[in-house]
C-alpha cells in the first residue's frame, strides 16, 4: 500500500513496528498487518487531551502557593493544557500529603483534571558515605516496603496514578541478593529474572497495596522509549499492560536519534500491543532543540495518541529547570516552552483533524536517487476524503511535484502558514514546498477510493 501513488518514489518504513511486534510470537499477525498496511487503525473519536506533569520540586516550590498556581493556570489555559499529573515521589523526595491535596483541589477548582504520578527510584539504603542508587534493586525488602508506602500514599489522594518508567532493574551477578534469588528460581537468564521480578513488584507493592487504600485506584505503567532493551531489563508490554489495565509510552526523540519518527511508530505499535489500552504518549524537552521538541508533539499526535503528556512543568516553566536524569543542566527547555506556545494552536488543529480518522499508514519520501529526504508522509481518511500529513525533519527546504499534474489543496501547515507552500511550477506541474521542520497537511491529489484490499 502506498500513500503517494502519484508523487515521487517512496519506501515503506516498518522496521520499528516490526521490532516491537517480534517481542512475542503471538503478535505475528499484528506485525504482518502493520507492515503490509492492510489493517487500518482508527484514532479515538473523542477530543485530544493535552496534559502536563509536575515533578516533586515544582510541587514543593512554584506550585505550593496561590500566586504560583495562578501563574501556572494562566499558562496552562493559554496552551491548551486541561489535565495535570502531580508527582508524589521522585529520587528519595516526596510531596507531603496535605500539600498534594491542597494542590489537587486548587487545580480541580480551576477546571483541570488532576491525576498522580510516582517515579520509583532511590528506594534502597545508600552505601556508607554515598547516595542511594538511582535504579532500584527490587530484591531488597526495604525497597519494596518503601514503594508500597508511596503507592498507598498516592492512592489516598488520586484515583489515577501513572508509574514512571523506572521499574526496570540492572542487577546481575554482582548483586548477591538477586543472584541468589535467580539461582533459587532456576531462571535461565537475567532478562527472565527481571521480567518475573517486575510482575511481582507491580502486583504487590503497587497494585495490591494501592487498592487496599483505594479500591477504585487505577495504576498505569509507562513504558520507556528505549524499546530495544525492554525485555532484558524487565518490561513485557503485553503481560504488563494486562496486569495494570492501562499503559503509556514514551515518545521522546532526542537530537541524536537517527529515527526522528520513532515516537509515531511507538505510539501506534503500543496501541496495537495493548489492545487499545495505551492512554497516550509522553515526551520531554531533554537533549533536544526547540524544533525537535515540537516535532515530538507532532509525531505523538500522528501516531494516534489520545493524550499528549508534556513532561514537565519543571523543565519548561520553573525558574530553575534543574538537572536532567543524566545529571546535566536542562539548558534549552525554556526555549522549548516558547516553541510549544507558538505551535500548540496548530497542534490542536492537527489533533482535531485526525480525530476519528482512519490511519492508512506512513512512509519516508525518498528522492529519485533513492536517498531519504527526511520527510515522512502519513496517510489518513476522514469524511470520505483522503489526506496526507508531511513532516520535514531536516534543516533544509524540501519540494516535490505531482507527476499526474493534479492540484494539491492545503488543509493545515505548521508552525505557520508559510511553513508549507502549495504552488504551481508550470501549468501542469503542481508542486509543494515544505520549509525546514515544517508540517503540511493536504488532500491527496489522487483521491480515488481504494479497494477493500488496500491496493
Language model region names:
Residues 1-9:
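N-terminal Sec-pathway targeting helices
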Residues 10-22:
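Bacterial N-terminal signal peptides
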Residues 17, 24-26, 187:
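Helix-centric, low-specificity signal for extended rod-like, repetitive segments
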Residues 21-33:
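Signal peptide processing junction and immediate N-terminal pro/mature segment
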Residues 30-405, 415-438, 442-450, 454:
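Glycan-processing catalytic domains of CAZymes
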Residues 411:
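Short glycine/Trp-rich loop-beta-loop segment that forms part of the substrate-binding cleft
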Amino acid at each position: 500500500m502506498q500513500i503517494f501513488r502519484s508523487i515521487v518514489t517512496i519506501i515503506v518504513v516498518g522496521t520499528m513496528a516490526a521490532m516491537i511486534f517480534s517481542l512475542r510470537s503471538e503478535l505475528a499477525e499484528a506485525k504482518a498487518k502493520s507492515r503490509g498496511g492492510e489493517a487500518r487503525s482508527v484514532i479515538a473519536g473523542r477530543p485530544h487531551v493535552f496534559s502536563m506533569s509536575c515533578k516533586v520540586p515544582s510541587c514543593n516550590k512554584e506550585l505550593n502557593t496561590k500566586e504560583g498556581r495562578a501563574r501556572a493556570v494562566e499558562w496552562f489555559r493559554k496552551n491548551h493544557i486541561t489535565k495535570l499529573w502531580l508527582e508524589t515521589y521522585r529520587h528519595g523526595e516526596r510531596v507531603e500529603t496535605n500539600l498534594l491535596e491542597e494542590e489537587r483541589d486548587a487545580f480541580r477548582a480551576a477546571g483541570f483534571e488532576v491525576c498522580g504520578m510516582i517515579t520509583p527510584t532511590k528506594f534502597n539504603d545508600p552505601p556508607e558515605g554515598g547516595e542511594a542508587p538511582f535504579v532500584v534493586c527490587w530484591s531488597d525488602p526495604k525497597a519494596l516496603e518503601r514503594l508500597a508506602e508511596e503507592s498507598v500514599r498516592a492512592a489516598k489522594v488520586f484515583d489515577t496514578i501513572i508509574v514512571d518508567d523506572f521499574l526496570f532493574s540492572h542487577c546481575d551477578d554482582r548483586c548477591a541478593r538477586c543472584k541468589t534469588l535467580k539461582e533459587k528460581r532456576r531462571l535461565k537468564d537475567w532478562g527472565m529474572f527481571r521480567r518475573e521480578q517486575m510482575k511481582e513488584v507491580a502486583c504487590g507493592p503497587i497494585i495490591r497495596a494501592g487498592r487496599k487504600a483505594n479500591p477504585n485506584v487505577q495504576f498505569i505503567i509507562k513504558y520507556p522509549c528505549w524499546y530495544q532493551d525492554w525485555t532484558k531489563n524487565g518490561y513485557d508490554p503485553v503481560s504488563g499492560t494486562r496486569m495494570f489495565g492501562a499503559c503509556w509510552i514514551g515518545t521522546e526523540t532526542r537530537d541524536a536519534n537517527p529515527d526522528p519518527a520513532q515516537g509515531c511508530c511507538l505510539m501506534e505499535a503500543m496501541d496495537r500491543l495493548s489492545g487499545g489500552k495505551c492512554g497516550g504518549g509522553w515526551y520531554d524537552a531533554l537533549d533536544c532543540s526547540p524544533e525537535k521538541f515540537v516535532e515530538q508533539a507532532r509525531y505523538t499526535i500522528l501516531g494516534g495518541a489520545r493524550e499528549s503528556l508534556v513532561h514537565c512543568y519543571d523543565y519548561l516553566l520553573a525558574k530553575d529547570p534543574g538537572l536532567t536524569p543524566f545529571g546535566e543542566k536542562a539548558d534549552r527547555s525554556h526555549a522549548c516552552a516558547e516553541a510549544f506556545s507558538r505551535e500548540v494552536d496548530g497542534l490542536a488543529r492537527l489533533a482535531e483533524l485526525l480525530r476519528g480518522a482512519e490511519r492508512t499508514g506512513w512512509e519516508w519520501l525518498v528522492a529519485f536517487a533513492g536517498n531519504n529526504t527526511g520527510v515522512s508522509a502519513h496517510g489518513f481518511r476522514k469524511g470520505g476524503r483522503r489526506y496526507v500529513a508531511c513532516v520535514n525533519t531536516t534543516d533544509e527546504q524540501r519540494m516535490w511535484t505531482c507527476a499526474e499534474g493534479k492540484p494539491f489543496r492545503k488543509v493545515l501547515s505548521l508552525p505557520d502558514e508559510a511553513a508549507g507552500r502549495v504552488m504551481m511550477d508550470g501549468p501542469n506541474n503542481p508542486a509543494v514546498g515544505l520549509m525546514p521542520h515544517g508540517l503540511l497537511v493536504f488532500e491527496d491529489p489522487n483521491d480515488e477510493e481504494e479497494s477493500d484490499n488496500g491496493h
